[in-house]
């Protein structure tokens, strides 16, 4: 086996040194990671400032607010959607479904009035 040449030894030494430096750079200091501040929406900002004073009535108001949001999103909105679907898509509309009327031929009797349909007139000059 041949030994490394001086250039190869120098290159290996530099690569090891570079690797050690890279690994050391990967360690985080006690100040890292620096995260950007969270941006709050207007409602979240309001409730955070409202609940800073932890009085019982404020907690109750917040609880009522949360329950009303739950009722609105999980009960009322689905109920409205179901009501709309039932009203406009499922229930039978008066005159919504039109059926073809049965054919009437000469000699037939109309059930509602009892009227008998008279025979058709003969038209000798026209071909049928």
Curated annotation (Swiss-Prot):
Q: Membrane spanning segments where? A: 68-86
Annotated membrane topology: Single-pass membrane protein
Where are residues bearing N6-acetyllysine located in the sequence? 24
Q: Which UniProt keywords apply?
A: Acetylation, Electron transport, Membrane, Mitochondrion, Mitochondrion inner membrane, Respiratory chain, Transmembrane, Transmembrane helix, Transport
Query: What is its subcellular localisation?
Result: Mitochondrion inner membrane
Q: Give a yes or no for keyword Electron transport in this entry.
A: yes
Q: Which domain of life is it from?
A: Eukaryota
Instruction: Write down which residues bear the modification named N-acetylthreonine.
Output: 2
Keyword Transmembrane applies:
yes
Q: Name one GO biological process term.
A: mitochondrial electron transport, NADH to ubiquinone
GO CC annotations, alphabetized = mitochondrial inner membrane; respiratory chain complex I
Cite the InterPro entries for this sequence. Answer: NADH_DH_b-subcmplx_su6 (IPR019174)
On subunit structure and binding partners, the annotation says: Complex I is composed of 45 different subunits.
Homology family: Belongs to the complex I NDUFB6 subunit family.
Q: What does this protein do?
A: Accessory subunit of the mitochondrial membrane respiratory chain NADH dehydrogenase (Complex I), that is believed not to be involved in catalysis. Complex I functions in the transfer of electrons from NADH to the respiratory chain. The immediate electron acceptor for the enzyme is believed to be ubiquinone.
- State the protein's name: NADH dehydrogenase [ubiquinone] 1 beta subcomplex subunit 6
Give the species.
Pongo abelii
What gene codes for this chain?
A: NDUFB6
């Amino acid at each position: 086996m041949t030994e490394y040449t001086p250039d190869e030894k120098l290159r290996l030494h530099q690569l090891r040194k570079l690797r050690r430096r890279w690994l050391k750079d990967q360690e985080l200091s006690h100040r890292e990671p620096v995260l950007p501040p969270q941006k709050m929406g207007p409602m979240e900002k309001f409730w955070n400032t409202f609940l800073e004073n932890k009085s019982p009535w404020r907690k109750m108001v917040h609880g009522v607010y949360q329950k009303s949001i739950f009722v609105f999103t999980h009960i009322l909105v689905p109920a409205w959607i179901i009501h709309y679907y039932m009203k406009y898509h499922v229930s039978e509309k008066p005159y919504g479904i039109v059926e073809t009327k049965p054919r009437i031929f000469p000699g037939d009797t109309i059930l509602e009035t009892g009227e008998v349909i008279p025979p058709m007139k003969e038209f000798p000059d026209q071909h049928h």
